[in-house]
Amino acid sequence: MVELLVAMVISLFVIGGAISLLIASKRSYTESERYARMGENGRFALQILSMDLRHAGFFGEAAPPGIEADAGLDDVTDDCTGEAAVYDVENFLFVARADADGEAIGCIDDAVPDSDVVVIKSVRPRPLSDGERDDPGDDTGTIDTPESLGGTNTYVMANAINGVLFDGADTAPSIGIGGDVPLGNAWEYRYQAYYIRDGDVPQLSRKIIRWDGAGMAVVTE
């Protein structure tokens, strides 16, 4: 009987040790998985930010000083201010600093106080043309290759001489010989303002432009 009790006590110690080891292993695995996920998210964020930085100031064939706004270009809802204004393409890359209240560039109010904001303006590196590059017989003066203009985007119509910034919902600048932008291509306009959003866990966020049902608006992503 005594031997049985001793064996049971020893078994309890062994089982308790095994359970403790299992709990410790589980905790270690959970922590490792969390850090791995954080590392993966960090690498993805750096990849996106690096790509946007490489394209800062790229507006197709045109240089920023040669780009003008179309007369029908609508204002952006909740636009940023100063050099950070969405359609101020000449200031295509700069760094601002949030104040002590977490406010910056007129459109950010939730940044980590005294943190940096990186503003990047460019076009998507994918030209849209009237098909002439692929088929000399398809020269209609209408952007249709590889797709038509979307009514919920903003574009830069550009050639090597000049460019026009316009809403996709409006009539596009003419691209025929003698037109607004002769032999021009359309490029989707992009705006990013990267910053660290304040909170229990600060996170990398960005302001972009997106169609809100009535026009282009600055939103948080």
Question: What spans do the regions from the language model cover?
Answer:
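N-terminal pilin/flagellin-like segments and related low-complexity appendage regions
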Residues: 45-221
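Aliphatic-rich helix starts adjacent to a transmembrane/signal segment
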Residues: 1-2, 6-56
